[in-house]
C-alpha cells in the first residue's frame, strides 16, 4: 500500500459566529439573524462543494507535504483490511490539539478523565496522542505511525484519528481510512448532516471515509459602523441587499472607497468564496480547466485593486489584520465562526470584535472554510467503539445541542441547529 500522499483542499474551521458579533446592539435579535445567515450558507455550501471535493479540487493553499515513504516500505507495511474480531483494551486517538479531546471528555457518555493524556470508557483505556500541526509535525507523526499499523501490537494501533479539510483527501484516498459503512454506519444515520461535510471526505470510489461534528459555513462579516455610515443601516437583511451578488458587491466597494473604507482587506479574502462556487474540477479529461468563476475573481480583483478599493495582502499578515480595528478602515471579511472567535482580536481592547462591532450576512455566494473530521483507522481493534464515538459525537441531537450551548460550535446536525435558532432562551 502506498503511503498517504498530500492533496490540496480548503483550510480550517472551528466555531459558529454567535459569540462575539453583536455584544452591545440588539443582542438577542441580532444573534438569531447571524445564526440564520449561517444556516443559509451551510445549505448553500452543501449544494456547491460537490463540484470540487476530489483530488482535482481547487484550493486556496495546500498543506505542507508530508514525506512519502518508499514503495518498498509501503509494500512491506500492508494494512490489515478487516478490523480485529476481538475488541482491544487500549483506544488510541491521534489529533493535533485539545479540541476534540475536550468535546469527548465533556459530552461522550461515560467518559472518565484520568489525566491530561489518558481517559477511560468502561474497561477501555483511551490514550491521546496530540502532536501540534506546526511544521507539519502532526501529519509526519501520523504518517509514520500509519505505515507501521499492520505490524503494530494491538495496544499500539491507531484506532481513530482526525483530519482537516486542507489535507483530508491525502488520507481519504488511501486504505488507511475505513469506509464508515464498514463500521456499520448507514446513510440513514447521517441523514441530518450537511452534505458538504460528507463530500469533503468521500474518496474517488464514492466511499465516505470520515464524519464531522462541525459545520463551518462562511458568511460576510461586516463592520457595523461602516455599514451605518455608508449604507444607512447595519441590519443584516438590508446590508445583504448591497452585497447580494458580485456585481452589487463591487458597486458597493465604490461607495466604501468614497467614504474612506476598503471593501475588503485583500483580494485574497474573496478567493475562497469564488473557488467554492466552481462548476467543475481543475483537471478534466487530462486537461487543466480554469473555471469561469475563478476568472471572474481575477477580473473583479484587478478592478478593485486598480480602483484602490482593496489591497493584495497575504492572509494572516499584519497588514491584512489592520481591519480588525476601527482605524484599519475595512468594511468586511469573509469567514466562518472561528475567524472572529479566534483570529480577529476579539479579546483585545479596542478591536471591533471586542466592542461587538461586527455583523454578518450571507454575502454574494455561499461557501465554507475548513472543518475537522473523525476517521476510523484501518486495522483498529476497537471498531465498535469507533462506531459509537462517531454516532454519539456527530449524530445524537441532544449531544449536538449540548455542544452548541457549551462550546459555541456550529454543529453538523440540521435539526439541532434549526432548533437552536428557534430557541429564544439560547444566547451564546
Name every feature range the model reports, one short phrase each:
Residues 130-144, 244-248, 312-326:
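Short helix-initiation/N-cap motifs at beta->coil->alpha
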Residues 75, 79-83, 136-139, 150, ...:
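Hinge/lid segment of periplasmic solute-binding proteins
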Residues 165-181, 195-238, 250, 266-287, ...:
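Periplasmic solute-binding protein
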Residues 248-257, 286-318, 357:
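Glycine-centered hinge/linker elements that transmit conformational signals in sensory
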Residues 6-29:
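Short, Lys/Arg-enriched N-terminal segments with co-localized hydrophobic residues
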Residues 46-50:
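C-terminal motif of bacterial Sec signal peptides marking the signal peptidase cleavage site
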Residues 89, 122, 147, 347-416:
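Extracytoplasmic/periplasmic substrate-recognition and gating elements
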Residues 14, 36, 52-169, 187, ...:
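Conserved N-terminal structural module of periplasmic/extracytoplasmic solute-binding proteins
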Amino acid at each position: 500500500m502506498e503511503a498517504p500522499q498530500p492533496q490540496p483542499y480548503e483550510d480550517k474551521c472551528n466555531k459558529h459566529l454567535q459569540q462575539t458579533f453583536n455584544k452591545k446592539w440588539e443582542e438577542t435579535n441580532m444573534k438569531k439573524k447571524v445564526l440564520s445567515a449561517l444556516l443559509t450558507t451551510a445549505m448553500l455550501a452543501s449544494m456547491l462543494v460537490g463540484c470540487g471535493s476530489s483530488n482535482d479540487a481547487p484550493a486556496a493553499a495546500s498543506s505542507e507535504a508530508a514525506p512519502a515513504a518508499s514503495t518498498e516500505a509501503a509494500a512491506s507495511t500492508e494494512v490489515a483490511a478487516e478490523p480485529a474480531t476481538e475488541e482491544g483494551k487500549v483506544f488510541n486517538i491521534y489529533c493535533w490539539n485539545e479540541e476534540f479531546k475536550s468535546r469527548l471528555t465533556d459530552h461522550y457518555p461515560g467518559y472518565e478523565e484520568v489525566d491530561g493524556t489518558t481517559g477511560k470508557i468502561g474497561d477501555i483505556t483511551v490514550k491521546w496522542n496530540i502532536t501540534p500541526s506546526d511544521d507539519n509535525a502532526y501529519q509526519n507523526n501520523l504518517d509514520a505511525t500509519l505505515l507501521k499499523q499492520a505490524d503494530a501490537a494491538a495496544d499500539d494501533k491507531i484506532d481513530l484519528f482526525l483530519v482537516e479539510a486542507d489535507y483530508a483527501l491525502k488520507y481519504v484516498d488511501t486504505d488507511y481510512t475505513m469506509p464508515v459503512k464498514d463500521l456499520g454506519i448507514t446513510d440513514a444515520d447521517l441523514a441530518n448532516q450537511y452534505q458538504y461535510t460528507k463530500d469533503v471526505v468521500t474518496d474517488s470510489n464514492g466511499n465516505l471515509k470520515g464524519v464531522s461534528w462541525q459545520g463551518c459555513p462562511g458568511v460576510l462579516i461586516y463592520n457595523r459602523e461602516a455599514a451605518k455610515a455608508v449604507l444607512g443601516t447595519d441590519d443584516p437583511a438590508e446590508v445583504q441587499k448591497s452585497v447580494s451578488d458580485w456585481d452589487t458587491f463591487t458597486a458597493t466597494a465604490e461607495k466604501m472607497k468614497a467614504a474612506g473604507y476598503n471593501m475588503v482587506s485583500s483580494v485574497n479574502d474573496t478567493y475562497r468564496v469564488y473557488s467554492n462556487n466552481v462548476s467543475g474540477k481543475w483537471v478534466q479529461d487530462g486537461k487543466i480547466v480554469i473555471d469561469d468563476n475563478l476568472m471572474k475573481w481575477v477580473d473583479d480583483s484587478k478592478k478593485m485593486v486598480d480602483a484602490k478599493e482593496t489591497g493584495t495582502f497575504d492572509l494572516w499578515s499584519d497588514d491584512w489584520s489592520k481591519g480588525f480595528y476601527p482605524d484599519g478602515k475595512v468594511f468586511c471579511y469573509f469567514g466562518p465562526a472561528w475567524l472572529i472567535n479566534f483570529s480577529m482580536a476579539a479579546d483585545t481592547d479596542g478591536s471591533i470584535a471586542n466592542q461587538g462591532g461586527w455583523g454578518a450576512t450571507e454575502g454574494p455566494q455561499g461557501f465554507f472554510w475548513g472543518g475537522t473530521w473523525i476517521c476510523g483507522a484501518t486495522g483498529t481493534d476497537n471498531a465498535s467503539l469507533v462506531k459509537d464515538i462517531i454516532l454519539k459525537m456527530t449524530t445524537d441531537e441532544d449531544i449536538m445541542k449540548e455542544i452548541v450551548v457549551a462550546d459555541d460550535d456550529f454543529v453538523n446536525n440540521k435539526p439541532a441547529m434549526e432548533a437552536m435558532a428557534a430557541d429564544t432562551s439560547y444566547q451564546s
